[in-house]
From Swiss-Prot:
Identification of the protein by name: Peptide chain release factor 1
Keywords per UniProt: Cytoplasm, Methylation, Protein biosynthesis
Described function: Peptide chain release factor 1 directs the termination of translation in response to the peptide chain termination codons UAG and UAA.
Gene Ontology cellular-component annotations: cytoplasm
Species in which this protein is naturally found: Rhizorhabdus wittichii (strain DSM 6014 / CCUG 31198 / JCM 15750 / NBRC 105917 / EY 4224 / RW1) (Sphingomonas wittichii)
Maturation and modification: Methylated by PrmC. Methylation increases the termination efficiency of RF1.
Xref: PANTHER family: LD18447P
Gene Ontology molecular-function annotations: translation release factor activity, codon specific
Length: 360
């Protein structure tokens, strides 16, 4: 485990023991006990992984001693040699599991996420593709037991979306979807193409960790809230009351418009949720760039202008350009469950990059 110091592991184990003693006292206020329990749940897996590595190493030392004891029983020596080989095979995986648990965690990983998809170059075909992507993420979410709530949608004339925003709620949503941010490109024959020519279109995906009220404080004086009547395709009014809401955050200039609900109150609540999430992401980006002279990750830059993936319909393939992975299972991926293989490969690549940095 090059680069992993025993001092850090000892510090974690000492903190684990301290937390156990504190929680056993029985006289703590409930809020303090809850916080200590969270701290314990975070470091206990690290301590367990360290204990497993230590146990395997100690067992290997004993077995090596038995195998090298020429005065010992020949049958016992043979058994010791065999068991030592088994432990040598298990030890690297145990060490890697410990190393992964020691990596710095993204505090947002366990959060729910805001998913935003916008049609890019390609007109009607790009909007249809944006709809395909949204359905892919919906099905993927359903497969994992997450809840998807539509926040806003701007439908296109031939189907699909010019823009769609949804909240995806569940444990660890952001951790699995954060590498989806970027430009997704599609190559296929559009429904409007009579000559059978393949066109290239694109849609942009942004995945943001959802913010809670405690994360972002918004002063009322920093907001300008305008209300007006909702409008449908072509600009015609679809509501007789002023239910649509436009919120402008004056310090940053961020503008959020929400008109999908018939209730002004519901539209305002949804708009504030989107605004809070975008402000939280701005702060995350600021802190990351401050820390960052740091890691230029091939996988996790999160740059929304970066072309990350191509969906080629004639060849039935999906290629993720960040890790040079091509899967000839386009239909299965667009159906949702097949997306997990891409997501898993991206997470594994990110872990490998961070482990290499830890060892370096």
């Amino acid at each position: 485990m090059a680069g992993i110091t025993s001092a850090r592991i000892a510090q974690i184990e000492a903190r684990r023991d301290e937390l156990q003693a504190l929680m056993a006292r029985g006289d703590l206020p409930s809020d303090q006990f809850v916080q200590l329990s969270k701290d314990y749940a975070e470091i206990e897996p690290v301590a367990q992984a360290a204990g497993e590595v230590r146990r395997l190493r100690a067992e290997l030392d004993v077995l090596k001693g038995m195998a090298e004891d020429e005065a010992g029983d020949a049958e016992l020596r043979a058994m010791a040699i065999e068991e030592a080989e088994e432990i040598r095979a298990r030890l690297p995986e145990a060490e890697r599991a410990l190393a992964l648990k020691l990596l710095p965690r993204d505090a947002a990983d366990e959060r729910s996420a805001m998913l935003e998809i916008r049609a890019g170059t390609g007109g009607d075909e790009a909007a249809l593709f944006a709809g395909d992507l949204f359905r892919m993420y919906q099905r993927y979410a359903e497969d994992r037991g997450w809840r998807v709530e539509l926040i806003s949608a701007s439908a296109a004339d031939l189907g699909g979306y010019k823009e769609v925003v949804a909240s995806v709620t569940g444990a660890g949503v952001f951790a699995r979807l954060k590498f989806e941010s970027g430009v997704h490109r599609v190559q296929r024959v559009p429904v409007t193409e009579s000559g059978g020519r393949i066109h290239t279109s694109a849609a942009t995906v942004a995945v943001l960790p959802e913010a809670e009220e405690v994360d972002v404080h918004i002063d009322d004086k920093d907001l300008r809230i305008d209300v007006y009547r909702s409008s449908g395709p072509g600009g015609q009014s679809v509501n007789t009351t002023d239910s649509a809401v436009r919120i402008t955050h004056l310090p940053t200039g961020l503008v959020v418009i929400q008109q999908d609900e018939k209730s002004q109150h519901k539209n305002k609540a949804k708009a504030l949720k989107v605004l809070r999430t975008r402000l939280y992401e701005m702060e995350r980006e600021r802190l990351a760039s401050e820390r960052a002279g740091a890691r230029k990750s091939m996988v996790g830059s999160g740059d929304r202008s970066e072309r990350i993936r191509t969906y080629n319909f004639p060849q039935g393939r999906v290629t993720d350009h960040r890790i040079n992975l091509t899967l000839h299972r386009l239909s299965e991926i667009l159906e949702g469950p097949g997306l997990d293989d891409l997501v898993g490969a991206l997470i594994a690549e990110d872990e490998a990059e961070r482990l290499a940095q830890l060892d370096g």
